[in-house]
Amino acid sequence: MKNRIQQLSFFFSLFVFSTMYSQYTDIINSNKPGFSESPYSVGTGVYQFESDFFYKNTSTKPTFSKPHTFGVDLFFRTSFFLEKLEINTQLTYQRETIDNDFNDGLSKFTLGAKYLLFEPVYKDATKEIRSWKKQNTFDKRRLIPSVGLYIGMHTDFLDTIHKKNSMSPKVGVLLQHNLTNNLNIVSNVFYDKIGTNSSEIYYVISTTQNFGYRWSGSIEYQEIFNKQQ
């Protein structure tokens, strides 16, 4: 028997609103806010830290308890060898409250890597100086997504209550459609906690529109299919 968890999220952000960075570049390549992940690396020689806070009030089982979870995600990204290859680490520290009982500690410590397998090349419409139509016609090649592959491993260096006494892999396919210079759609499919009783398959779709140098808005949908423990 499987559980289905659906989540719809809206984000309206002002530059560095819900994410903190330690980086100096002209353009920040971030996966935050939200849960989707771009197939693109941060680039060689970049050391980037991202973080956000979360609050969950959900229950995947028909019980009378009302679990609440509050925590922080820490994400470190860098690239040592290749422009297309990124090495990353994700840590999650959370506090769970069920009725009058609570526990807190490190609930996730994941080491991962992603590689950009394919990136389409688009027409440079600005060079079409003699034709307004060619300058403004939609480039059908933008329907072809950039493709990335993610491989990660959940370690067991966790707080006692979250320990599984084993490690488990995570794999995913990362897609990004750049429909315009300011509008993109990111789609992810992951197979997580492979080989465990809590293994799950989930997908995330997020659309982001840039309104200017500082403002952007996004909408995201996530659905999770997991085993019932």
Label each PLM-derived region with a short phrase.
Residues M1-I28:
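Bacterial Sec-dependent N-terminal signal peptides
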Residues Q23-Q229:
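Transmembrane beta-barrel domains of Gram-negative outer membranes and organellar outer membranes
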